[in-house]
Regions:
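Membrane-interface aromatic/basic loop that binds lipid-linked glycans or pyrophosphate carriers
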Residues: 156-230
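Generic detector of well-ordered alpha-helical segments enriched in charged/polar residues
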Residues: 33-34, 137, 166, 174
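Catalytic core of nucleotide-sugar-dependent glycosyltransferases
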Residues: 90-97, 103-130, 145-177
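Donor-binding/catalytic cores of nucleotide-activated saccharide
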Residues: 1-85, 92-106
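All-alpha amphipathic helical-bundle segments outside canonical DNA-binding/catalytic cores
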Residues: 131-140
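Intrinsic disorder/low-complexity segments enriched in polar/small residues
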Residues: 9, 142-145
């Protein structure tokens, strides 16, 4: 139903999402979906061949009126596909421009991040199986932190920071008891403390958590670079 190849990106200082699956046939939705939410194949829609009957059957169309629609489309693809073939060879070359929406996003781009998260939430809510999937829960909550990190980094508009947080806080499909049953990782448990705090305190906590996670990530990358240089 889906064929994915590897790719090379030029013009980007930061690493692009890798394809970390070997060449071969991946059968069964559980395998296809788990490899996606674990970040083993990339979110971008390009360099994927998808069966036309499959697209029509599942109405797998791009959401109109937004950017970053790849995030929503690829997630739906992963949730629906029963089989996937991977070719671990470069079949696509992508040159990232300095003024691309990934490197210099506008407020509209950031607003669309919030919209996309809402669409993904609605899609998960439409299926009990998706709601009960532990990896989906970890993916969705981690996506909130990822999007909020982009928002904090690319705009200083604190009003937008807060309004985005309110959306992320409200898009919660698991109760505290259900969260525990889904066995989140320790880092996610720390992140999710914001849910039990009063709203504004939760906002401050979530903001601090996301910033701290970013600084720790940058520090680890720099340390690896230093050791590699030696």
């Amino acid at each position: 139903e889906c064929l994915i190849g590897n790719y090379v990106v030029t013009g980007a200082r930061r690493c692009a999402p890798p394809l970390s699956l070997g060449t071969g046939f991946y059968e069964g939705n559980a395998l296809v979906l788990s490899t996606y939410v674990q970040g083993k194949w990339y979110v971008m829609a390009w360099n994927k061949l998808v069966s036309r009957p499959f697209v029509l059957q599942h109405q797998l169309y791009f959401q109109e009126g937004i950017v970053h629609e790849d995030d929503l489309w690829s997630f739906k693809l992963a949730c629906m596909a029963q089989s996937m073939y991977v070719v671990d060879e470069t079949t696509y070359y992508y040159s990232m421009q300095p003024d691309s929406i990934m490197r210099a996003p506008s407020m509209r781009n950031l607003e669309c991040r919030v919209l996309v998260l809402g669409y993904i939430y609605d899609f998960i809510r439409s299926s009990r199986c998706l709601q009960d999937n532990r990896l989906i829960y970890i993916y969705f909550e981690s996506l909130k932190a990822k999007y909020f990190d982009r928002i904090l980094y690319f705009t200083k508009d604190t009003s937008f920071h807060y309004q985005s947080y309110l959306v992320f806080r409200n898009k919660k499909y698991a109760s505290l008891l259900e969260m525990t049953g889904l066995r989140p990782e320790w880092k996610l448990m720390l992140q999710n403390i914001h849910y039990v705090l009063p709203t504004y305190a939760g906002y401050l906590y979530f903001k601090a958590f996301v910033k701290s996670a970013y600084y720790l990530l940058v520090l680890s990358i720099k340390m690896k670079a230093v050791f590699h240089a030696k």
